[in-house]
Amino acid sequence: MAQNGQGIEPAVLDDIINRLLEFRNARTVRQVQLSEAEIRSLCTASKEIFLHQPNLLELEAPIKICGDIHGQYGDLLRLFEYGGFPPEANYLFLGDYVDRGKQSLETICLLLAYKIKYPENFFLLRGNHECASINRIYGFYDECKRRFNVRLWKTNTDCFNCLPVAALIDDKILCMHGGLSPDLTDLDEIRNLPRPTDIPDSGLLCDLLWSDPSREVKGWGMNDRGVSYTFGSDKVAEFLMQHDMDLVCRAHQVVEDGYEFFAERQLVTIFSAPNYCGEFDNAGAMMSVDENLMCSFQILKPTDRKPRFL
């Protein structure tokens, strides 16, 4: 592909990936010190690819789908150990790469590097934390400032503003970070969302990244997050029927087993950060979709061993 590695020499890109993977079998999760120029070049090259590809990605199975990572870099490496390091498998990540965990920079750098190296096999969606007003507060800004400078945080923000927001797998599985929206009646509405863009406080883009399913509501309800809506199983069934789809696949909420079904298996939540924040005893999961659109789950068990950061 012409856009493959645009702006980064393939040998330089491979060197960055090799350094990021250097500690993949170590018992301790170490910091990987890339230069500011290297991180900047990852942001610039990947941004070009994101804008070259549609806002609603149209993908084919087989593919592995991962939920929130939140800077838990050691767990991201464990996911790849389980699922196969790219290009062994195709991947779709559902957003929330940064904040809360200690290694947001390593996490986003490896994901962007794989996006540049394998643009047609490796896909990243935007989560609600890929937004300046959120990651300014929950850790990513502080990590950028501590390890580099505020300018690098702004470079990442420019990149995040170009991420696609949804993916459709074989016309049957719709994937996004948050959930459905009362403003979503036609998939062209997703395709036509402008980029680059910040995330607004309401409307379709906001809902795709912020809404949550709820067993307590029918239709649309208030969301405790103070942003967007909750939606009942009736809205999931209605949406799938109208669009001749089988499944909504989303992330955005910690679930004990790493995955959780809703609405008679018409929606699944995937969360891929085990022992989230060191405060939860949740597992992490990755969903494998095979050629026949059969879904199975690979589980990262919560580990008793707290990683030591060097």
Swiss-Prot record:
Keywords linked to the UniProt accession: Hydrolase, Manganese, Metal-binding, Protein phosphatase
Cofactor: binding comment: Binds 2 manganese ions per subunit.
One Pfam family of this chain: STPPase_N
KW Transferase (keyword) present: no
Top-level division of the source organism's lineage: Eukaryota
Binding site for Mn(2+) 2: D96, N128, H177, H252
Any coiled-coil regions, as ranges: none
Cellular component GO terms, alphabetical: cytoplasm; nucleus
Residues annotated as the enzyme's active site: H129 (proton donor)
Keyword Manganese set for record: yes
Gene3D superfamilies: 3.60.21.10
Catalytic activity line of the entry: O-phospho-L-seryl-[protein] + H2O = L-seryl-[protein] + phosphate; O-phospho-L-threonyl-[protein] + H2O = L-threonyl-[protein] + phosphate
Binding site for Mn(2+) 1: D68, H70, D96
This enzyme's EC code(s): 3.1.3.16
GO molecular function, one term: metal ion binding
Cofactors named for this entry: Mn(2+)
Family according to the record: Belongs to the PPP phosphatase family. PP-1 subfamily.
PANTHER family named among the record's database cross-references: SERINE/THREONINE PROTEIN PHOSPHATASE, SERINE_THREONINE-PROTEIN PHOSPHATASE PP1 ISOZYME 2
Name assigned to this protein: Serine/threonine-protein phosphatase PP1 isozyme 2
Organism encoding this protein: Nicotiana tabacum (Common tobacco)
